[in-house]
Design a protein with these regions (language model features):
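Proteolytic processing hotspots in large secreted/extracellular or virion-associated proteins
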Residues: 1-39, 43-44
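Exposed aromatic-hydrophobic patches
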Residues: 29-31, 62-67
Length: 263
């Protein structure tokens, strides 16, 4: 996916040959002018390509990145439907660069597409390092071998999700804003992060429409700066049952890592 836009590459050599090393153990940097649209890629021996951690240092005007699995390349952000200057551009680049989001196609991010429950759980699974589930899948609508099966199974066994009843997860269902808050809260709690912050949701005119099971999580998510109000008909509302776009969730996840994971 890096294609012809590769700007630089780096590798760890042992006796003249590229060698693998654990993620985060070797860091390199290259001089660049600006880097919101740069991403770091690891090229494995089998030819597969995966995103690795990288970040732009504006002060040094360098792009630092992990060197893993032999050769790591620096390439331009590949999505043609994520335009520089849009409110979600940095979040989409961050989520993609850190391996949290995949594109809908090699060149399409689909920022306005609605996030599904399977997509959100898969993002958190990647954030957790893609751990192998220890328990069997118990959801009747999550087939073996689907791209989200391991993520959903892991999330269920760790209390991140509990399904919608009747042994169903509804992987293709659109995730709502209050469901997003609940899932993020459960993930943070399972990792031992501080989830004590609370906001007064009554400042929003539709606070009464928040489901009882989501009140604590949405109050925390609002206090943590993850889910804020959205403007509709001149009013700032919570819109708890409203859906969330991929661009919105990318922004939420970037803030989540900054304000919760790295707090």
């Amino acid at each position: 996916q890096a294609g012809s836009a590769v700007l630089a590459n780096a590798s760890v050599l042992v006796d003249g040959a590229a060698a693998s090393c654990p993620a985060g153990s070797v860091r390199a940097a290259v001089a660049v002018n600006a880097a919101d649209d740069l991403t770091a890629w690891s090229l494995a021996d089998d030819g597969s390509i995966s995103a690795v951690s990288g970040a732009y240092d504006a002060g040094q005007q360098t792009y630092a990145f992990d060197v893993v699995n032999g050769v790591t390349a620096i390439a331009r952000f590949p999505f043609t439907d994520v335009v520089a200057g849009t409110w979600y551009y940095g979040a989409a680049a961050y989520a993609y660069n850190n391996g949290l989001f995949a594109g809908m196609t090699p060149t399409t991010f689909a920022p306005n597409a609605t996030m599904t429950r399977a997509m959100l759980v898969s993002v958190l699974w990647r954030l957790a390092g893609e751990p192998a589930p220890k328990a069997p899948n118990t959801f009747v609508d999550v087939p073996d071998g689907a791209w989200y099966t391991d993520a959903v199974t892991w999330a269920a066994e760790n209390g991140v999700v509990s399904g919608i009843g009747g042994s169903r997860f509804d992987p293709s269902g659109f995730v709502t804003r209050e469901q997003t808050a609940e899932i993020l809260y459960n993930y943070a709690h399972s990792k031992g992060y501080d989830v004590s912050a609370r906001a007064d949701l009554t400042v929003f005119p539709d606070a009464g429409s928040v489901s009882g099971w989501a009140e604590k999580a949405l109050s925390w998510a609002n206090a943590a700066g993850l889910i804020n109000g959205t403007v509709r008909d001149g009013q700032t509302i919570l819109d708890p049952q409203g859906s969330a776009s991929r661009a919105q969730v990318a922004m939420i996840l970037m803030n989540y890592v900054e304000h919760v994971v790295n707090a």
